[in-house]
Amino acid sequence: MICGLLPLLHCYNLFISNQFCYIRSMAQQKTGNEVKEPFTEYGRYSYSDYLGWHMDEMVELIKGRVFRLAAAAPKRIHQKISGKVFNRLFNFLEGQECEVYEAPFDVRLPVNSKKNEDIDTVVQPDICVICDKSKLDDLGCLGAPDLIIEILSSGNNKKELKNKYEVYEESGVREYWIIHPYEQTFITYTLIEGKYMPSKLFTSGDIIVSSSVAGIQLDLEYVFQDLD
């Protein structure tokens, strides 16, 4: 629930920065990324609906509501950081049991039923690591990845900080990393007894060690260098 998230976000206002600190009022508002389309007669869209869409823009489905990924292509710095992180993880995991994927890659997060018509959350994380290969199919991933990494962009900060935090926690994503490319900061959330526990605020010079995927380490000096 958002009430559980607010104290954590407040404690890390340096990470979120001043422009994101209105997240408290956001809980009562629709985000600007929500696609203005009429809902189906039953009130929410499902993955079955999602599969039948032919849209010019990329969208995600979060608890039955449609959100655009961004108004435009991700910024250069976002893509540069994404490429650096993905390449490091791919090289480390090559030949191992776990696999890493980058967007666009559908991650379906079922609540109870795994039927397409019952799934109402389909997201495209910037990067995700899946160690249980039974969750992988031709459509992407069905079930919670072990590790999800999101890189904030100016158009989607609300979605990452509120909506995705909630669905990742509820779905059992064991570890969730958030990278702020312009603040050059990094925070991790580790799932403990069904609730996310935040790390300290990391920045350039720190080494991130994954708690969910053995052996994964990420040097933030490498991630944040040469971004200009």
Question: Language-model features: where?
Answer:
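Residue-identity detector for glycine
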Residues: 3-4, 32
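Gly/Pro/Ser/Thr-rich low-complexity, intrinsically disordered segments predominantly at protein N-termini
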Residues: 10-228
